[in-house]
Amino acid sequence: MEVNVVNIKNEVVGKVQLSAEVFGVQLRRDVLRDVVTWQLAKRRAGTHKTRCISDVSGTTAKPYRQKHTGRARQGSLRSPQFRGGAVVFGPVNRSHAYSLNKKVRRLGLKVALSMKVSDSKLVVLDDSGLLLEKTADAHVAFGNFGAHGSYLVVAETYEDKVMCACRNLPNVDLLKYAGINVLDILRHDCVILTVGTVKCLESRLCNG
């Protein structure tokens, strides 16, 4: 499929051919869900923890004798039924990350990119298009791409002045090509890829 290549003013400066193997994949919501759930699980800190009976400080003595008190028998004041006692089967420190097949991860990225193309929310930017020096310039530049709520720009590298110009814009995120992922693509309304990024993605995803 052929799409327009635009500059930072959203003026057409050329054409680029997009591989249907990467940007023309059928929508698979189940794959998107699997990949997003996997990403969110990896982000969890896993620092939740409650005290089990060995963690609770206090005496280990039996509170009162076993029989002839008229009360239920007890063996420890640190038991879960007492105030300040332990928690049974509570959360512990652990990693929530799990493995997901590489082919599923690649397919999820293809589906997310294809969905943006089908919704006309993917813009291919000329490699020399990111010439921004001030936040005011960046605000005007992204306004040229329409009334989208948020923008994700993916390029191979960024100059420091471009990053400084965009970091104060709450609806614009810059991402390097190596870090492109399904969750960030779905969280942003408009995805802007440079021509170089498109070629890198096709060479990376067409083989798997």
Curated annotation (Swiss-Prot):
Keyword annotations from UniProtKB, A to Z: Ribonucleoprotein, Ribosomal protein, RNA-binding, rRNA-binding
One of the record's GO cellular component terms: ribonucleoprotein complex
Superkingdom classification of source: Bacteria
A Pfam family per the record: Ribosomal_L4
Record GO biological process: translation
InterPro entries documented for this protein: Ribosomal_uL4, Ribosomal_uL4-like, Ribosomal_uL4_dom_sf
GO terms of molecular function: rRNA binding; structural constituent of ribosome
PANTHER family per record: 50S RIBOSOMAL PROTEIN L4 (PTHR10746), LARGE RIBOSOMAL SUBUNIT PROTEIN UL4M (PTHR10746:SF6)
Its job: One of the primary rRNA binding proteins, this protein initially binds near the 5'-end of the 23S rRNA. It is important during the early stages of 50S assembly. It makes multiple contacts with different domains of the 23S rRNA in the assembled 50S subunit and ribosome. Forms part of the polypeptide exit tunnel.
Family to which the UniProt record says this protein belongs: Belongs to the universal ribosomal protein uL4 family.
Quaternary structure (record): Part of the 50S ribosomal subunit.
The protein's name in its UniProt record: Large ribosomal subunit protein uL4
Organism: Anaplasma marginale (strain Florida)
